[in-house]
Amino acid sequence: MKKYLVIGNPIGHSLSPLIHNYWMKKYKLVDSVYEKRMVEENDLKKVIEEIRKDEVVGVNVTVPFKKLIIPFLDKLDFVAEETQSVNTLFKINNQIVGHNTDSAGFQDSLKEFYPRSNNSMMSLPLEDKHIFILGAGGVTASVISALKSEGANNIFLSNRTKEKANELKKLFPEIEVIDWGKRPPICSIVINTTSIGLTKDEEINIDFNNYDMNHHKDFLFYDLIYNPKETVFLKKARLRGNKTMNGKTMFLNQAKYAFNIWTNIMPEIDDEVIKFLD
């Protein structure tokens, strides 16, 4: 039996096993199973040894280990190196490689809101967008990397702990860090990468009066949280007439790319998969 894992702490809420086990059944990988495992930091070395011994084929890594896992790996792909964030592990030529599929997953999700022109090689129309990111956690670097690759060059970042925001600025010197509670003078996309909103009624310190569709016809509020489907952040934005998006599409697409790394199969995100998140 080929075993795949998602590791994190906490991990009970993870929907990854539902998605990957569905795909394994759909594509007749009958000798494969995907499980979730709660681990501590001192368990990471053991997980890596399981991969080396072929006891585990592939692993997804979630909070808080996306950076902490890196010292145990032999190699990183380009995006994982750039972001210093890993969410997928796979052994290639006896080397355990850390991949980042979060960035591609986020990139794909933006295509729903900013579809490409007829030339599929063109970047999304983000060059003139002023983008405001809230949070500086494990996935934020992946979001910045995706935005940069699509031509965004006006990125503002704010985090409750300014030191963490400044750490990201070392990776991406072109971003501008602003104090928590303040906002950039111009903005057309606001992205929440914090965990604020996972608990009912949690609110982000943001003045919605400054973000109305009257000012920007394509204003977007994006929350990486997908459960609940509509956070207070998104609900307030929607009620003021702004367009909103949650993290469901990003989550499904990052899973799709991880599955492809492990199996060389690009799975379809069909209605059954989407139901798991509804």
In which residue ranges do the predicted regions lie?
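Glycine-rich adenosine-cofactor-binding loop
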Residues: G8, G98-S103, L110, Y114, ...
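Short glycine-rich anion-binding loops that position phosphate/pyrophosphate groups of nucleotides
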Residues: V61-L68, G137-V139, S195-L198, N227
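Phosphate/diphosphate ligand-binding glycine-rich loop within oxidoreductases
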Residues: K2-Y114
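Rossmann-like adenosine-cofactor binding region
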Residues: P173-T244
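N-terminal Rossmann-fold cofactor-binding loop
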Residues: S158-K162, I225
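Nucleotide and nucleotide-moiety/phosphate-recognizing core
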Residues: K111, E127-D128, L147-N154, K162-G181, ...
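Adenosine-phosphate binding glycine-rich loop
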Residues: D128, K217-L220, L224-D278
